[in-house]
């Protein structure tokens, strides 16, 4: 065979190889495109909206914020109906333990959530907010109370009961400050403490900073040292939810950017933060004590999501 003919055959063979490679590459690209399209279609299908009823058991201090988050969630999921039971955290755990049905549990401290976890009533918990205590008095501060000291002598002070998260925090705070209180009443819900001060039935009450904000111009707020006493708020899906998909949607909303912004507006601190406070609402009395709790301003609202963390099951 001549050199010219061998060269021609070699050239033809090379062209055939290149042609096959090109076809293979085209087929591969086509396959990749199809897979990508299928993945896109699958992702789109996975974005289905939650429907049905979701029952949320939540600490009383969360009422305003959670009801606002509810509106956004239901607007985004037209077929979803969220209902709440706002009570003291210990009562919520007892309700679950007694067999009452619910999809989500949100408590005002880790110790009550731990009780639920120990009884296998909930799944994984996620911390979504923090809160600290403050002192409130009726508008105008008629008793001229200045803090947790002698100015409370003879005053009708109302606190939360020791078994309630705000009462547990109050006990820790007074122990840290070396202060002895003599409340005339101990309530099962922090909102009941606030209500008695708003109505003038009590001269002073120890509540969360978020409750002081919720009271708006009905009370004056007297800042007190928090002494590192911070309540950490965890949320969890119950162990036997009737609407797991709906529960997940609500929990994601609470821990997500929008929910965290709402919580910050209501005075809650970011998850894991050492301080929390009200950005609006009750005014601080001029006679307030030194070392006040830091307020959570609207400028913080973009940061809580970055600080989101899974709650430890030990008490704060």
Whereabouts are the PLM-identified features?
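Sec-dependent bacterial lipoprotein signal peptides
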Residues: 1-21
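A generic structural motif
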Residues: 77-84
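Ligand-binding clamshell of periplasmic/extracellular solute-binding protein-like
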Residues: 86-93, 101-116, 122
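Exported/periplasmic ABC-transporter solute-binding proteins
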Residues: 2, 16, 24-62, 67-71, ...
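PIN/NYN-family metal-dependent endoribonuclease catalytic core
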Residues: 132
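Short, high-confidence coil segments that cap the C-terminus of an alpha-helix
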Residues: 79, 101-102, 202
């Amino acid at each position: 065979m001549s050199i010219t003919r061998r060269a021609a055959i070699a050239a033809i063979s090379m062209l055939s190889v290149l042609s096959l490679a090109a076809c293979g590459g085209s087929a591969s690209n086509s396959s990749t495109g199809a897979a990508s399209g299928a993945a896109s279609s699958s992702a789109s299908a996975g974005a289905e909206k939650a429907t049905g009823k979701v029952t949320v058991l939540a600490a009383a201090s969360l009422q305003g914020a959670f009801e606002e988050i509810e509106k956004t969630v239901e607007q985004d999921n037209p077929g979803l109906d969220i209902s709440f039971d706002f009570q003291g955290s210990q009562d919520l755990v007892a309700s679950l333990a007694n067999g009452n049905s619910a999809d989500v549990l949100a408590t005002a401290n880790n110790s009550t959530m731990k009780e639920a976890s120990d009884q296998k009533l909930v799944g994984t918990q996620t911390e979504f907010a923090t809160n600290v205590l403050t002192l409130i008095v009726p508008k105008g501060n008629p008793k001229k109370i200045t803090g947790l000291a002698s100015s409370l002598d003879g005053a009708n002070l109302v606190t939360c009961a020791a078994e309630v998260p705000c009462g547990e925090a109050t006990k820790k705070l007074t122990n840290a400050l070396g202060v002895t209180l003599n409340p005339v009443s101990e309530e099962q819900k922090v909102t009941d403490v606030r209500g008695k001060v708003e109505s003038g039935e009590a001269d002073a009450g120890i509540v969360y900073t978020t409750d002081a904000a919720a009271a708006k111009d009905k009370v004056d707020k007297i800042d007190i040292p928090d002494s590192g006493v911070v309540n950490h708020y965890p949320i969890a899906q119950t162990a036997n939810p009737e609407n797991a998909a709906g529960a997940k949607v609500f929990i994601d909303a609470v821990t997500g950017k929008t929910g965290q912004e709402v919580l910050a507006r209501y005075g809650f601190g970011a998850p894991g933060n050492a301080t929390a406070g009200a950005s609006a609402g009750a005014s601080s009395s001029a006679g307030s004590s030194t070392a006040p709790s830091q307020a959570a301003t609207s400028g913080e609202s973009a940061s809580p999501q970055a600080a989101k963390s899974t709650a430890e099951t030990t008490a704060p």
